[in-house]
Amino acid sequence: MTTLMAEIAEQPAVLSGLRKFYTSPGAIPSKGLRTMVRDWPPTVVFTGMGSSMYAAYPAQAYLASQGIRALVWETGDLVDHHRKFFGPDTLLVVVSQSGETAEVLRLLGALPTKEGMVAVCNMETSALARRANLLLPMMAGRPAPVGTKTYTCAVAVLMYLAVAIARKPPHPLTQSLMHAIEAQEKIIDRHDELTPPTVEFFDKPNYIALLSRGADLASAYQGALLFKEVPKMGAEPMSAAQFRHGPMEIINPAHRYIIFARKGESKLKREADNGLLRLAGDIRKHGGRVLLYADLPFADLTNVRLIPVEPVRMGLGTLIDSVHIQLLVHDLALRAGLEPGSFRFAG
């Protein structure tokens, strides 16, 4: 078993431990959160780099659905260009596996000491953990170059934080997390059955686009990063709506299009999900090959490979989607003669 495969296989157990911790009383102190900002509810700014940033999309989408202002900002861009955005009602949530990336250290040096800050971090002795008003541990275990456990753990921690900010009971989130963990276990157990046909369908594309909407954009962005890091393939994440405004012009049989389509919890979201299925059909019609991860019915069509996924609420679909993509990129790397999870240039 490769090191990356071992990391992938550990995710259900790690998330189970995380669930137990964050359902314990006082894991996220509501009174402590309230004292960090002048006005409540706050304007929540999630920031991170790479998978740490992408992990925030479900929490941001959830808070927005509750009428709470929330943004996701890349840390490097935030510290260089948007520092003056912060005000007395801003709650800054910094997500970082190490807690000591160059961008995070620069942000810590630039912020006023009175800025209310929550750290979601895997290294509890890091500079970020020491500076934050509240530390929420990722509990992802030993760090690895490719974000597997750290990504899925960050998604779950941020959702528990979002529920606490919205002052909602955590039970529905915990139920959804347990469901996602069970789905992960099934996918990993069926790896040898599910992934090889997908590898054959995927073949060797010269361009990959990953498309979705809302909270599931996390799957598109994290998936694109995994394609770059593991099998060293060029991949572009994008909003499915944005794809129709120009990028459709480069649809090509040599390209692969990955669409994440999950049933929404509101009428508006369900309409968007139907749009994702229509997009899959349109890409196929124009000659593209589509890998469709969906919990919605879709016709069995040539050049579309449907991977049914378990429906899961509370924006946690990415916990399932990402395991599918992790296994796919792992096997694509092996097929290309690469060591899965080994970096050539980045540290």
Regions found by a protein language model. Name each.
Residues T2, A6-V45, L134-L136, G141-I258, ...:
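Active-site phosphate/pyrophosphate-binding segments
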Residues A27-I28, M36-E185, R213, A254-H255, ...:
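Glycine-rich phosphate-binding loops that contact phosphosugars or nucleotide phosphates
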Residues S219-Q222, A235-P237, G246-M248, K267-L276, ...:
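Extended hydrophobic-aromatic, low-complexity segments
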Residues E229, G281-K285, H330:
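Short basic/hydrophobic patches in alpha-helices and adjacent helix-turn junctions
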Residues N303, V312-G347:
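Generic C-terminus detector
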